[in-house]
């Protein structure tokens, strides 16, 4: 049995930018995940369920667990003195860690993805993304350090809190998964160099918004529902409502996750920096593809911390099909 810590140290030689700092940074995220796992499991017994009454930078009501997870991850990262600052979906602006100007890395995160599912005991997750800073080491980080395209990511990953808790990450050398053993308090390697199955047969989208979707996406959904034995259609529809959970299932079983623009969110709803970029990095490392329907997600130059984007991620052939339908059936 190989633990996450042992695996990270063992694989450092495969990563050209590997340093003890990056190893310690991943360990800090691991610690934060353990704390969140512990408290999610007893959320119904203590007062951390439901809405907090506050709103995040996008005007969305924050759940109590959103704030809890944000504070725990932030504390775990700051305590190691290896991160110069963070950007979070739950923070209006970047958080600069005083006394950590010497650190080389910044972290972007969605502390608790799908938190509205907590009250009904459905899987949720944590998403993280790591970059090398671009401003001089020894100075405080600025927003410039965080507004980097996804192709500059050093590492990215997610933790899914479900029937078991799993941490999945990449440093650009494949995607690896670890299951948390609460009796030992460690994450143990369960899958190395994960890949999307050759063919996907599942599509994940909130079809309740169908009437608001672009024409190309509507046509693609109909394509998924048509019978065609040569392409194994119709595909199966599966939608949990938690990006991490939907992505994880599709990574294991094969499929595509779609969150297009709508009339109410013309630029898309998912956050480019906290959700799209890290999941796109993982998808490509697992042989998949991620797009906004027209452009590779990892090539998009961010303009703001909380920028939103349409998002299509999963098996390469399925994302290719979505892009084709969007090209062939543009909105008037």
Curated annotation (Swiss-Prot):
Belongs to the FBPase class 1 family. It comes from Salmonella gallinarum (strain 287/91 / NCTC 13346). This is Fructose-1,6-bisphosphatase class 1. Keywords: Carbohydrate metabolism, Cytoplasm, Hydrolase, Magnesium, Metal-binding. The gene is fbp. Pathway: Carbohydrate biosynthesis; gluconeogenesis. InterPro entries: FBPase_C_dom (IPR044015), FBPase_class-1 (IPR000146), FBPase_N (IPR033391), FBPtase (IPR028343), Fructose_bisphosphatase_AS (IPR020548). Its cofactor is Mg(2+). Mg(2+) 2 binds at residues 110, 113, 275. Binds 2 magnesium ions per subunit. It catalyses: beta-D-fructose 1,6-bisphosphate + H2O = beta-D-fructose 6-phosphate + phosphate. Substrate binds at residues 113-116, 206, 239, 257-259, 269. It is found in: Cytoplasm. Mg(2+) 1 binds at residues 89, 110, 112. SUPFAM superfamilies: Carbohydrate phosphatase (SSF56655). GO terms for biological process: fructose 1,6-bisphosphate metabolic process; fructose 6-phosphate metabolic process; fructose metabolic process; gluconeogenesis; sucrose biosynthetic process. Its EC number is 3.1.3.11. GO terms for molecular function: fructose 1,6-bisphosphate 1-phosphatase activity; magnesium ion binding.
């Amino acid at each position: 049995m190989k633990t996450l810590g042992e695996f990270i140290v063992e694989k450092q030689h495969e990563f050209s930018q590997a340093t003890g700092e990056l190893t310690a940074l991943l360990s800090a995220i691991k610690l934060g995940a353990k704390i969140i796992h512990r408290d999610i499991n007893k959320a119904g017994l203590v007062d951390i369920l439901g809405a907090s009454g506050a709103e995040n930078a996008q005007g969305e009501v924050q759940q109590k667990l959103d704030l809890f997870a944000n504070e725990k991850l932030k504390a775990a990262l700051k305590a190691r003195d290896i991160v110069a600052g963070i950007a979070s979906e739950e923070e209006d602006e970047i958080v600069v860690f005083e006394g950590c100007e010497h650190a080389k890395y910044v972290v972007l995160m969605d502390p608790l993805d799908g938190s509205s599912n907590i009250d009904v005991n459905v899987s949720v997750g944590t998403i993280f993304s790591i970059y090398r800073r671009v401003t001089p080491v020894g100075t405080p980080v600025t927003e410039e350090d965080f507004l980097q395209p996804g192709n500059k990511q050093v590492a990215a990953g997610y933790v899914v809190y479900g029937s078991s808790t799993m941490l999945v990450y990449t440093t650009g050398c494949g995607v690896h998964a670890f299951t948390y053993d609460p009796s030992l308090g460690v994450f143990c390697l369960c899958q190395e160099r994960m890949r999307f199955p050759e063919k996907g047969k599942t599509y994940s989208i909130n079809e309740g918004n169908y009437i608001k979707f672009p024409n190309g996406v509507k046509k693609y959904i109909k394509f998924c529902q048509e019978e065609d034995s040569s392409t194994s259609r119709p595909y199966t529809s599966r939608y949990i409502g938690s990006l991490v959970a939907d992505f994880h299932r599709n990574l294991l079983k094969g499929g595509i996750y779609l969150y297009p623009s709508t009339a109410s969110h013309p630029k898309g709803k998912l956050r480019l920096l906290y959700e799209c970029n890290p999941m796109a990095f993982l998808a490509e490392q697992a042989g998949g593809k991620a797009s906004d329907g027209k452009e590779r997600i990892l090539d998009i130059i961010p303009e703001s911390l909380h920028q939103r984007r349409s998002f299509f991620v999963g098996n390469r052939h399925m994302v290719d099909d979505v892009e084709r339908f969007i090209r062939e059936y543009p909105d008037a």
